[in-house]
Amino acid sequence: MGVTKKPDLTDPILRAKLAKGMGHNYYGEPAWPNDLLYIFPVVILGTIACTIGLAVLDPSMIGEPANPFATPLEILPEWYFFPVFQILRTVPNKLLGVLLMASVPVGLLTVPFLENVNKFQNPFRRPVATTVFLIGTAVAIWLGIGAALPIDKSLTLGLF
């Protein structure tokens, strides 16, 4: 929590404390040594202890053992790879699919240069960045949902 009160340097009590080297008590606790030597290690070690405790008391099983003679019909990646998987699955040329995936970060890197005259942080005053974000989010969700569907319904999501 930050200090919101500015010190009054004309206050004789504060001036006496500052002369004795006790000024930090007026402003709050110092970060060194209290936070860095006592509070942070307790939080870090407590987090590690909770993680190890959960791993020992409730271990997560990896899953059922693999059966090499029973392959599923369609192998899907993890959910966060669904949009990329959908691009590779629907684009006929694999090189074009890889170039499409590489164009996403390149396109995102060009957004600040397209809108470099706008110094505002309010998203409503940055229409290019807001439009790129909204369209990119909609496309990523569309591709992610489509990747979980069969290939014939993947682009239309079965709606059309």
Swiss-Prot record:
UniProt cross-references to SUPFAM superfamilies, sorted A to Z: a domain/subunit of cytochrome bc1 complex (Ubiquinol-cytochrome c reductase) (SSF81648)
Pfam families: Cytochrom_B_C
Keywords for this protein: Chloroplast, Electron transport, Membrane, Photosynthesis, Plastid, Thylakoid, Transmembrane, Transmembrane helix, Transport
Keyword Transmembrane helix: yes
Annotated signal sequence range: none
Localization annotation: Plastid, Chloroplast thylakoid membrane
Protein topology in the membrane: Multi-pass membrane protein
GO cellular component, one term: chloroplast thylakoid membrane
GO BP term (any one): photosynthetic electron transport chain
Superkingdom of the organism of origin: Eukaryota
TM regions (residue ranges): 36-56, 95-115, 131-151
Record HAMAP family: Cytb6_f_subIV
Assembly description: The 4 large subunits of the cytochrome b6-f complex are cytochrome b6, subunit IV (17 kDa polypeptide, petD), cytochrome f and the Rieske protein, while the 4 small subunits are petG, petL, petM and petN. The complex functions as a dimer.
NCBIfam families: cytb6_f_IV
Function: Component of the cytochrome b6-f complex, which mediates electron transfer between photosystem II (PSII) and photosystem I (PSI), cyclic electron flow around PSI, and state transitions.
UniProt similarity note: Belongs to the cytochrome b family. PetD subfamily.
Name used for this protein in its record: Cytochrome b6-f complex subunit 4
Origin species: Chara vulgaris (Common stonewort)
